């Protein structure tokens, strides 16, 4: 009898995480910098680097009503913490004052590469 090693299961390509509640009509909206700051608080648990500087955030779309739509990727489709990281990003941004409902959509198009790292992280890693 041999022990069979199974490959990690890829995360669903259409995975979406949501968090937050709608803003009141007269509420002041958060700044783009506040949203980026929240994303920088979310770390990839394997690399211990934040998702923004890793280049995992492809798009931030801040709506007039305070809702925020984010397109995010992972370093690998088989990332064991992928769903949790996407949910953590949604929760972090939704905790910012002036943000309503946050939707984080997963994509692997284009696939992530080290070219997407911030310059600071590239220098730190010697890339």
Short names for language-model regions:
Residues 1-127:
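Domain-level signature for proteins that mediate thiol-based redox and metal-cofactor handling
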């Amino acid at each position: 009898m041999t022990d069979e090693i199974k490959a990690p299961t890829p995360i669903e390509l259409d995975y979406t995480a949501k968090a937050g509640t709608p803003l009141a009509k007269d509420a002041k909206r958060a700044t783009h910098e506040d949203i980026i700051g929240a994303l920088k608080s979310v770390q990839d648990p394997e690399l211990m680097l934040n998702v923004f500087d890793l280049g995992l955030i492809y798009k931030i779309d801040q709506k007039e009503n305070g809702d925020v739509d984010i397109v995010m990727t992972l370093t690998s489709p088989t990332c064991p913490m992928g769903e949790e990281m996407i949910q953590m990003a949604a929760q972090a941004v939704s905790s910012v004052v002036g943000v309503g409902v946050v939707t984080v959509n997963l994509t692997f198009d284009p696939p992530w590469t080290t070219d997407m790292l911030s310059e600071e992280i590239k220098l730190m890693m010697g890339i």
